[in-house]
Curated annotation (Swiss-Prot):
Highest taxon of the lineage: Eukaryota
Any GO MF annotation of the entry: protein serine/threonine phosphatase activity
EC number(s) stated in the UniProt entry for this protein: 3.1.3.16
Function, in words: Serine/threonine-protein phosphatase essential for chromosomal dynamics during meiosis and mitosis. Antagonizes the function of air-2 in the regulation of chromosome cohesion. Dephosphorylates histone H3 at 'Ser-10'. Also involved in the activation of chloride channel clh-3 during cell swelling and meiotic maturation. Essential for embryogenesis.
The keyword Metal-binding belongs to this UniProt entry's keyword annotation: yes
Keyword annotations: Cell cycle, Cell division, Chromatin regulator, Cytoplasm, Developmental protein, Hydrolase, Manganese, Meiosis, Metal-binding, Mitosis, Nucleus, Protein phosphatase
Listed name of the protein: Serine/threonine-protein phosphatase PP1-beta
Pfam families according to UniProt: Metallophos, STPPase_N
Bound cofactor: record note: Binds 2 manganese ions per subunit.
GO terms classed as biological process: cell division; chromatin organization; meiotic cell cycle
Protein family membership: Belongs to the PPP phosphatase family. PP-1 subfamily.
Encoding gene per record: gsp-2
Binding site for Mn(2+) 1: 63, 65, 91
Length: 333
């Protein structure tokens, strides 16, 4: 939007207009509006640290994956910004039918409320992944490939971790064997792609595994798994109380690990129309007490929005501790 002013309030109200409509109705912003959202939010991401230091109270959400009407349900439940402060843990795009609406609303809120609304990078905010799992195809179908590249430039500037009141460590994936000091995260220079290995890769890709002692191989073929004592040591070393991460489907929308020292959050109910999982949002109050708000899976007859979505025939993020729930064999991403 060179020279043009971004009409943020108008963009937000158009994106919210479909509340109450039958899920699946698109909001077609102009290409220059979307470009403006990417460019302005990118400037804000770069003006703020790559390791955010945030204060409670706030609400934390896990993967959304283009399930736009569920994102609206989350806000209806938690309060539309600026009623509540939010931290999202990444994976805004791919899989669901409406990645564009989802990411555009999140970027618009980031620009409107830069000190109260925060977005971390997930492993799907990466060109090599969202080229394959639906976002590229959605951009190409509804706009053009150039716009997808504009999003890539924006995603390459997202922060990758946050610490809430010096006690809760948040990232999309998990811990890294390379992570000894928080300074290492602060030293990551942006813009950056997500490498195939190393600290940044692990923060976005690793998973906890109760059956592993120390570090293990990850079934995803990327990064590592880590056991309960890795969590305990990390928290003790950095004087933290909790790790909060996303990245895996969990049946109830949230799941504790390592004696409640780590929690996984997942905020896309009925993920891809192939799971009966709930979605959840974690509220952290001023005293750092955590509570969970649950989005039950919607009635499939009433809301058939997941079935047949972009990428519904592609392999799905594997659920934790629920091999029976896996809908299809295939690569695990």
């Amino acid at each position: 939007m060179e020279g043009e002013k971004l009409n943020l309030d108008n963009i937000i109200s158009r994106l919210l207009e479909v509340r109450g409509s039958k899920p699946g109705k698109n909001v077609q912003l102009t290409e220059s509006e979307i470009k403006g959202l990417c460019q302005k939010s990118r400037e804000i991401f770069l003006s703020q640290p790559i390791l955010l230091e945030l204060e409670a109270p706030l609400k934390i959400c896990g993967d959304v994956h283009g399930q736009y009407y569920d994102l609206l349900r989350l806000f209806e439940y938690g309060g539309f910004p600026p009623e509540s402060n939010y931290l999202f843990l990444g994976d805004y795009v791919d899989r669901g039918k409406q990645s564009l609406e989802t990411i555009c609303l999140l970027l618009a809120y980031k620009i409107k409320y830069p000190e109260n609304f925060f977005l971390l990078r997930g492993n799907h905010e990466c060109a090599s992944i969202n080229r394959i799992y639906g976002f590229y195809d959605e951009c190409k179908r509804r706009y053009n490939i150039k716009l997808w590249k504009t999003f890539t430039d924006c995603f390459n500037c997202l922060p990758v971790a946050a610490i809430i009141d010096e006690k809760i460590f948040c990232c999309h994936g998990g811990l890294s064997p390379d992570l000894q000091s928080m300074e290492q995260i602060r030293r990551i220079m942006r813009p950056t792609d997500v490498p195939d290995q190393g600290l940044l890769c692990d923060l976005l890709w690793s998973d906890p595994d109760k059956d592993v002692t120390g570090w293990g191989e990850n079934d995803r073929g990327v990064s590592f798994t880590f056991g309960p004592e890795v969590v305990a040591k990390f928290l003790h070393k950095h004087d933290l109380d909790l790790i909060c991460r996303a990245h895996q489907v969990v049946e109830d929308g949230y799941e504790f690990f390592a004696k409640r020292q780590l929690v996984t959050l997942f905020s896309a109910p009925n993920y891809c129309g192939e799971f009966d999982n709930a979605g959840s949002m974690m509220t952290v109050d001023e005293t750092l007490m955590c509570s969970f708000q649950i989005l039950k899976p919607a009635d499939k007859k009433k809301y058939p929005y997941g079935a047949g979505g972009v990428g519904s025939n592609r392999p799905v993020t594997p659920p934790r501790n629920a091999p029976a729930a896996q809908p299809k064999k295939g690569a695990k991403k």
